[in-house]
Amino acid sequence: MPKYRSATTTHGRNMAGARALWRATGMTDADFGKPIIAVVNSFTQFVPGHVHLRDLGKLVAEQIEAAGGVAKEFNTIAVDDGIAMGHGGMLYSLPSRELIADSVEYMVNAHCADAMVCISNCDKITPGMLMASLRLNIPVIFVSGGPMEAGKTKLSDQIIKLDLVDAMIQGADPKVSDSQSDQVERSACPTCGSCSGMFTANSMNCLTEALGLSQPGNGSLLATHADRKQLFLNAGKRIVELTKRYYEQNDESALPRNIASKAAFENAMTLDIAMGGSTNTVLHLLAAAQEAEIDFTMSDIDKLSRKVPQLCKVAPSTQKYHMEDVHRAGGVIGILGELDRAGLLNRDVKNVLGLTLPQTLEQYDVMLTQDDAVKNMFRAGPAGIRTTQAFSQDCRWDSLDDDRANGCIRSLEHAYSKDGGLAVLYGNFAENGCIVKTAGVDDSILKFTGPAKVYESQDDAVEAILGGKVVAGDVVVIRYEGPKGGPGMQEMLYPTSFLKSMGLGKACALITDGRFSGGTSGLSIGHVSPEAASGGSIGLIEDGDLIAIDIPNRGIQLQVSDAELAARREAQEARGDKAWTPKNRERQVSFALCAYASLATSADKGAVRDKSKLGG
């Protein structure tokens, strides 16, 4: 029978000092012996996805204590990728994932907490907490802040839906008037919550559902809706049950590594491909799998991408649907239901509610359930009122979207495409693979060949795009922006958005060893591995080289002979200490980022730290 971890600090005469300090936090004699549960919050006023979380930790804590536990809350950092985008701040985004994971480990292990409720939401916070949860392997439930409502405005006498990416594209489009750009900017992000499309934050919150670590509805129920409060209340009650099951009944099925098994990871990736999730999810799932000591690799993702169709299409891949529409159609469980009926899921998995996949679908799939309360929950909709307050409205759709032929979520027979929304490509400068969000690629450019325009920083590429130096047919190559080379693996949302602003969205390709925002669409290929700074062949591409992209056949090829590439590699190596570094790039890199770069692996490994470099 496992011993409560917290007993280390609450029992025994020699722990009198620790108990004295616990008493100073409000604990009493009656609390010693109860499980101590960490409420891991991420409130900050910097991030709209987290601005409403200040009081939500208290909601969870009250339920924990009512159920017989002791709740202790702490906060992690949270970086807003949208605000950090397009300048030096983006260097810090991906490294913050490791800081978040480490800080959770530090706090939980330093104070011997028994379990956790993780209150996350945005891009690197959910992955960082997920990595920590699987590293620590103590009972955990995730409950995120929820998606933002889609923006809406009237343009050309038509009401259209908007999001952050629209504001970025129109702001850089010389054909758009100042007044229209201002109107879109003011309408794009109307409420608290994670940005309203299937961007990285919402993708990851959906994947925690598929992994079994959060409750049904977690990925899609709006941040502003009153129904979302119940997820927080339930999480506080349920975590005490899970904790007691493990420590008092020796039930290891309550542990995250047993819930988020390899079968669950395969289900999560299957969901990701079917819903056209952010390419960043590949990085984060690979990283989380390593923390769980699960053998889940790019090869597994490649195999899944070849058989899973696209059953859901959401912004940025279409302007018709946002997360509020996914929820109306049944949310994550709705997509999983269609995948299950197509025979594409592992059914022998459980979630934090203790339900198997078939049991979860029977109760929560809107196409199966007889529970009116569940149907009512999935009718929770937007109010269209600007607010930063959680649970501030109770609007509902008149009906569910259960149209699996033409609705937001489709059945296998009516799939958006037989190929899924993500694909892994391999070739002579991406030997370990690269990732493309096929959901956002127009059919006309699934095969594309063009001359390379090579840039050794995102900034130079942006200047060239806006300066008219990139023309139709070009393949923009941005290198030395990987985990080590950036350092920090910047997102390339501005270059891809500006290509659209310049009318080149369907006329050019962009390839990088960096990564893309979940808001990116178009022929944008990232995560090229090995990265240039690690000696990857992307560092050998020269202006004018022809690059052939073949998404249907999963290929990407630099049309240069092996002999020529060998000669270029020899010349690169001859640069000595300057080999595999960008030429003529001035970038101030802090000690903190240098420390990250010194251990960073390429994207095919999840951009995690290379433990072999630490010795031991």
From Swiss-Prot:
The active site is at residue 517. Pfam families: ILV_EDD_C (PF24877), ILVD_EDD_N (PF00920). GO terms for cellular component: cytosol. Mg(2+) binds at residues 81, 123-124, 491. Its cofactor is [2Fe-2S] cluster; Mg(2+). It is an enzyme of class 4 (lyase). [2Fe-2S] cluster binds at residues 122, 195. Pathway: Amino-acid biosynthesis; L-isoleucine biosynthesis; L-isoleucine from 2-oxobutanoate: step 3/4; Amino-acid biosynthesis; L-valine biosynthesis; L-valine from pyruvate: step 3/4. It catalyses: (2R)-2,3-dihydroxy-3-methylbutanoate = 3-methyl-2-oxobutanoate + H2O; (2R,3R)-2,3-dihydroxy-3-methylpentanoate = (S)-3-methyl-2-oxopentanoate + H2O. InterPro entries: Dihydro-acid_dehy_C (IPR042096), DihydroxyA_deHydtase (IPR004404), DiOHA_6PGluconate_deHydtase_CS (IPR020558), ILV_EDD_C (IPR056740), ILV_EDD_N (IPR000581), IlvD/EDD_N (IPR037237). Binds 1 [2Fe-2S] cluster per subunit. This cluster acts as a Lewis acid cofactor. PROSITE patterns: ILVD_EDD_1 (PS00886), ILVD_EDD_2 (PS00887). It comes from the Bacteria. One of its GO terms (molecular function) is dihydroxy-acid dehydratase activity. The modification N6-carboxylysine is found at residue 124. One of its GO terms (biological process) is isoleucine biosynthetic process. Its EC number is 4.2.1.9. Keywords: 2Fe-2S, Amino-acid biosynthesis, Branched-chain amino acid biosynthesis, Iron, Iron-sulfur, Lyase, Magnesium, Metal-binding. Homodimer. Functions in the biosynthesis of branched-chain amino acids. Catalyzes the dehydration of (2R,3R)-2,3-dihydroxy-3-methylpentanoate (2,3-dihydroxy-3-methylvalerate) into 2-oxo-3-methylpentanoate (2-oxo-3-methylvalerate) and of (2R)-2,3-dihydroxy-3-methylbutanoate (2,3-dihydroxyisovalerate) into 2-oxo-3-methylbutanoate (2-oxoisovalerate), the penultimate precursor to L-isoleucine and L-valine, respectively. NCBIfam families: ilvD, PRK12448.1. Belongs to the IlvD/Edd family. This is Dihydroxy-acid dehydratase.
